[in-house]
């Protein structure tokens, strides 16, 4: 039987570019990713997304658009990662390095998918087109997808 861990992920998108962070420590270290983390007791998923974005990048946002929800299973683990994905098109502040992440802008045609989670290349196009999606990815280790499902949806 699986338990579930509630997590957030925020992608900051500007015309022609996306802000990613190089994860410096912990789960996913050495990979480029959006900004996010665990939902803490007493906060909503959106509050957690805003808090994690601020902590990891120094940015604040007025509006977050929920764009996706992906459940991740890692073979041998008993906990599913239930990741709620948001897109932010406007922000305040300047991206700043934190203990956990080093932010960097990437042109849309130069996103470093080879240095990211293997699933990102599959759902990023939907996110960039502002299309909503639901997904499930089963990983062997941290690099090999053994099974997946990804569907575009009207609402989340």
Curated annotation (Swiss-Prot):
The record's subcellular location field reads: Cytoplasm, Cytosol; Mitochondrion matrix; Nucleus
Pfam families the UniProt entry points to: NUDIX
Biological processes annotated in GO: DNA protection; purine deoxyribonucleotide metabolic process
GO MF terms, alphabetically ordered: 8-oxo-7,8-dihydroguanosine triphosphate pyrophosphatase activity; hydrolase activity, acting on acid anhydrides, in phosphorus-containing anhydrides; metal ion binding; nucleoside triphosphate diphosphatase activity; phosphatase activity; RNA binding
| PROSITE patterns per UniProt | NUDIX, NUDIX_BOX
Activity regulation per the record?
Inhibited by TH588.
What does the record give as EC number? 3.6.1.56, 3.6.1.-
Record-annotated residues binding Mg(2+) 1?
36, 56, 100
Q: Where does 8-oxo-dGTP bind?
A: 23
Q: Give a GO cellular-component term.
A: nucleus
Q: Specify the domain of life of the species encoding this protein.
A: Eukaryota
Q: Which residues form the Nudix hydrolase domain?
A: 3-132
Alphabetical keyword list: Cytoplasm, Hydrolase, Magnesium, Metal-binding, Mitochondrion, Nucleus, RNA-binding, Transit peptide
Cofactor(s) recorded for this entry are: Mg(2+)
Family, according to the entry, reads as follows:
Belongs to the Nudix hydrolase family.
Recorded hits in PANTHER family, A to Z, give: 7,8-DIHYDRO-8-OXOGUANINE TRIPHOSPHATASE, OXIDIZED PURINE NUCLEOSIDE TRIPHOSPHATE HYDROLASE
Protein name from the UniProt record = Oxidized purine nucleoside triphosphate hydrolase
> From what organism does this protein derive?
Danio rerio (Zebrafish)
């Amino acid at each position: 039987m699986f338990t579930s861990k509630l997590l957030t992920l925020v992608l900051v998108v500007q015309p022609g570019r996306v802000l990613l962070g190089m994860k410096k420590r912990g789960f996913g270290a050495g990979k480029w990713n959006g900004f996010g983390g665990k939902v803490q007791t007493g906060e909503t998923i959106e509050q957690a997304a805003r808090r994690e974005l601020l902590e990891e990048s120094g940015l604040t946002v007025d509006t977050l658009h929920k764009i996706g929800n992906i459940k991740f299973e890692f073979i041998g683990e008993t906990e599913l990662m239930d990741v709620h994905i948001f897109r932010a098109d406007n922000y305040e502040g300047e991206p700043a390095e934190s203990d956990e992440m080093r932010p960097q802008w990437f042109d849309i045609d130069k996103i470093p998918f080879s240095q990211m989670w293997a699933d990102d290349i599959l759902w990023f196009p939907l996110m960039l087109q502002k299309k909503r999606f639901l997904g499930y990815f089963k990983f062997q280790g941290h690099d090999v997808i053994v099974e997946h499902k990804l569907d575009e949806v009207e609402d989340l």
